Swiss-Prot record:
UniProt organism field: Scolopendra dehaani (Thai centipede)
Catalyses which reaction(s): a 1,2-diacyl-sn-glycero-3-phosphocholine + H2O = a 1-acyl-sn-glycero-3-phosphocholine + a fatty acid + H(+)
Protein name: Phospholipase A2
Record keywords: Calcium, Disulfide bond, Hydrolase, Lipid degradation, Lipid metabolism, Metal-binding, Secreted
Transmembrane intervals: none
């Protein structure tokens, strides 16, 4: 779901800023 995607992305962003989101997509 969209909420789950956002949750995973935010969690990954907090752990690894400027690296990867919850789905392994590169985030700047």
């Amino acid at each position: 779901s969209l909420a789950n995607f956002l949750s995973m992305t935010l969690t990954a962003a907090k752990r690894k800023p400027k690296e990867y989101d919850g789905y392994g997509n590169y985030c700047g």
